Amino acid sequence: MNSKQYAYMNRSVRPSVSEIAAGLEKKFEITCLARDQEKLKLYRAICGVIAKVMIIPPECYIVVNKMPTYAGDVQAVYEKLTSAEIEWVAEKYCAQKDRIQNPHEWMRTTLYNSPEDMELDLLNQVLTDWGG
């Protein structure tokens, strides 16, 4: 076993959830996105959901879209997320938070689907604006 393999296996060497979340908060510039303390709290929760997924070994399964999915597949999508997608997820959450029974699961799935869903949502808005 080389030192890199040992470092990966040694949990104390890997970043913690809070360290990953702090890095995500900087990446997504959540202090710029948030218009008030409530939104800031929501953006931090979203970053926390992402961070919890990022520490799971890639070969493990997690539930996304009510289906077992490799954590590595979810992580690959999460690594490509942008501030715009994070903001879109937050807006969707605020619009239906009273109907969401498990916020953590909802966020995990919505984040995973956000690249395609956000694009479809924008396309539908354009078609609606054009009377289509």
Regions found by a protein language model. Give the residues of each.
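Electrostatic interaction modules used in gene-expression and signaling proteins
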Residues: 1-132
